[in-house]
Amino acid sequence: MELQEVLHMNGGEGDTSYAKNSFYNLFLIRVKPILEQCIQELLRANLPNINKCIKVADLGCASGPNTLLTVRDIVQSIDKVGQEKKNELERPTIQIFLNDLFQNDFNSVFKSLPSFYRKLEKENGCKIGSCLIGAMPGSFYGRLFPEESMHFLHSCYCLHWLSQVPSGLVTELGISANKGCIYSSKASRPPIQKAYLDQFTKDFTTFLRIHSEELISRGRMLLTWICKEDEFENPNSIDLLEMSINDLVIEGHLEEEKLDSFNVPIYAPSTEEVKCIVEEEGSFEILYLETFKVPYDAGFSIDDDYQGRSHSPVSCDEHARAAHVASVVRSIFEPIVASHFGEAILPDLSHRIAKNAAKVLRSGKGFYDSVIISLAKKPEKADM
């Protein structure tokens, strides 16, 4: 089976779907002020045709109602600028392209569009037709749009996914060089970590080059994804998965060879690695770069606001919170796990993930490290 066929979130609206378990809205709380700033700068820059139609893409949009939260925030940001400038700026038509791989569950997004449009009209006064939303399936590591056609590109929690599993993970004798690990984790040897970094560097460089060609001069990108801070101090979601698969091997439920042949194309870069790649590629200026932490159990409660949460061990509803973490991890990785190990292990694996999540929560290290970077395409000399 091709890698792109299993690199997608769990579709549908069931208990293990990404739509039911994503806490994307909580990440957007943290990202929204920077998103607003990007949109405000775009509209104030008087870029070609932007006052008539602002063209935006959400790269790696995933599925479910949460996919449209970014669209909502963009519309609100545009309205905010319009209110500040009053009659100087008419509301432009907003053309939104939702991008993900071909296997993404776009249908669940489309089903929520009628109610979303009605809500926009009620809350923001957007007439039907002033916000146009469509799909642009395909890999964001390849060309998606015509040259110099886009104003703003957004991507949230996608760029840690690589275009392919790095080479060099198997010896000449066909033996795994990354035994006991499923990606470039803390236990991986330096050559494995370098192989993953090299693949990330290649992919991110390609991403920047291709999308710089699609953006107009001084167009913006806002990117957020998991990063590596404090030398793996805080285990992320794939670390929980790795621990739990190892538990199943130790308990005799899985063969060690099956684990050793499972390599996930994910890399969590350091902020320095991100900065160096952007500067080396050369198409963009870094406007903003910051890291932040999000608790494992963010989104456990409907009223959860992780920004107000202290970084202390969680004891309240520990089992329920750990089960929530396991559901989130499963919604992200189930397709690729089931493809390699089979669906039969999923219930046991979820149980082990919950147990490991509870341990990490008790240790006070239950946080996902994330990086957010705002980029502006450098103008051509003729535009300066």
UniProtKB/Swiss-Prot annotation:
Cofactor info, note text: Binds 1 Mg(2+) ion per subunit.
Q: Its annotated pathway? A: Alkaloid biosynthesis
Q: Where is the site labelled Involved in substrate discrimination?
A: H154, I266, V328, E343
Q: Write down the InterPro entries for this protein, in alphabetical order.
A: MeTrfase_7, MeTrfase_capping, SAM-dependent_MTases_sf
Please tell me which top-level EC class this enzyme sits in. transferase
Annotated GO molecular function terms are: caffeine synthase activity; metal ion binding
| Cofactor(s) required, per the database record | Mg(2+)
Ordered alphabetically, the record's keywords are: Alkaloid metabolism, Magnesium, Metal-binding, Methyltransferase, S-adenosyl-L-methionine, Transferase
Catalyses which reaction?
Answer: theobromine + S-adenosyl-L-methionine = caffeine + S-adenosyl-L-homocysteine + H(+); 1,7-dimethylxanthine + S-adenosyl-L-methionine = caffeine + S-adenosyl-L-homocysteine + H(+); 7-methylxanthine + S-adenosyl-L-methionine = theobromine + S-adenosyl-L-homocysteine + H(+)
Is S-adenosyl-L-methionine among the key words of this record? yes
Provide an example Pfam family for this protein: Methyltransf_7
Which residues are involved in binding Mg(2+)? N178, D260, F262, N263
EC number(s): the record gives 2.1.1.160
Biological-process GO terms, alphabetical: alkaloid metabolic process; methylation
Question: Which residues does the record give as S-adenosyl-L-homocysteine binding sites?
Answer: Y18, C61, N66, D100, L101, S139, F140, C156, C158
Lineage: superkingdom: Eukaryota
**Biotech: how is it used?**
Tobacco plants (Nicotiana tabacum cv. Xanthi) expressing CaXMT1, CaMXMT1 and CaDXMT1 accumulate caffeine and become less appetant and toxic for caterpillars cutworms (Spodoptera litura). Caffeine also stimulates endogenous defense mechanisms against other pathogens (e.g. tobacco mosaic virus and Pseudomonas syringae) by triggering the expression of defense-related genes.
Positions of theobromine binding: Y157, H160, W161, S237, Y368
Where does the entry say this protein is expressed, by tissue? Highly expressed in developing endosperm and immature fruits (grains). Detected in young leaves and flower buds, but not in mature fruits.
Q: Which family does it belong to?
A: Belongs to the methyltransferase superfamily. Type-7 methyltransferase family.
Function field: Involved in the biosynthesis of caffeine. Catalyzes the conversion of 7-methylxanthine to caffeine, likely via theobromine as an intermediate.
| Identification of the protein by name | 3,7-dimethylxanthine N-methyltransferase 1
Protein's organism: Coffea arabica
